[in-house]
Regions:
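Amphipathic alpha-helical blocks
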Residues: 1-10
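Active-site-proximal segment of RNA-dependent polymerases
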Residues: 29-77
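A residue-level signal for conserved active-site and pocket-lining positions in enzyme catalytic cores
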Residues: 39, 134, 224
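Regulatory and interdomain segments flanking nucleotide-handling catalytic cores
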Residues: 55, 88-90, 225, 229
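Conserved polymerase palm-domain catalytic core
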Residues: 68-167, 171-188, 192-197, 207-219
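Active-site or ligand-binding cleft "flap/edge" segments
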Residues: 202
Length: 231
């Protein structure tokens, strides 16, 4: 879709570290938002979200993202750099086709998938922050990633390993008795996450990568929720 669509309004919101470009709708009842509501309903009725994603899913919240980790001692927090703007349209269309036809075949064809991507995006790459369709499409995009990364973590045979994702925030926690072992595990997990994300055209934001050992730091903050070390 072209940025000059009359139903689109572009706003620039200043945050602490940068200015975000928010693309939203001219009005609640404009043609584009009405169209997006229909697309959203169609997708929500047919898409089964990853069990690991806690953001943008009805009935899940920041608490559901943090609480599964509360009994672990070691935490690795990763951030996907500029997640929405770097979503690949070709891959997204393929994932829509796969996910919508997963439970029941012939729910959607490839031409319709390409139409959804074109209708819900601006330019040749990414999803706009501000479109009501972007959250569910972003979860479709990373559902496969969630499952592959968790499978890798399970193969590492970590004690009580937990993985969750809230939009672009990745949280991994586990138990281990050795700090030296923790550093090795941390490096393996970060390297594997980077490699997997690169297949989706995405990168880790190295500045926001964090690792916590509750024996040292005593607490960790996950999507605004504090987890503290129990005595």
């Amino acid at each position: 879709m072209n940025i000059n669509n009359p139903d689109i309004v572009v706003r620039h919101i200043k945050t602490k570290n940068k200015t975000r470009k928010i693309i939203t709708y001219r009005s609640e009842d404009c043609e584009l938002k009405t169209k997006h509501r229909r697309i959203n309903t169609f997708l929500q009725e047919r898409f089964i979200p990853s069990i690991f994603t806690k953001g943008y899913v009805k009935g899940r919240s920041i608490y559901d993202n943090a609480l599964p980790h509360m009994y672990n001692d070691y935490f690795i927090l990763l951030d996907i750099k500029d997640f929405f703007p770097h979503i690949c349209h070709k891959q997204l269309a393929a994932k829509i086709f796969h996910e919508i036809n997963l439970v029941k075949e012939n729910q959607i064809n490839k031409k319709e998938c390409n139409y959804i991507v074109d209708c819900c995006s601006i330019g040749s790459r990414g999803l706009p922050l501000g479109f009501i369709t972007s959250p569910i499409l972003s979860n479709m995009y990373l559902k496969e990633f969630d499952c592959i990364l968790y499978g890798y973590l399970k193969k590492m045979e970590l004690n009580n390993v937990i993985y969750t994702r809230y939009a672009d925030d990745i949280i991994i926690s586990f138990k281990t008795d050795s700090f030296v072992e923790f550093k090795e595990i941390e490096n393996n997990i970060v390297d594997t996450s980077k490699l997997l994300l690169s297949k989706y055209g995405l990168q880790i934001n190295n500045r926001k990568t964090r690792a916590y050992n509750l024996d040292i730091s005593n607490h960790v903050r996950i999507t605004g929720i504090n987890i503290t070390k129990s005595e």
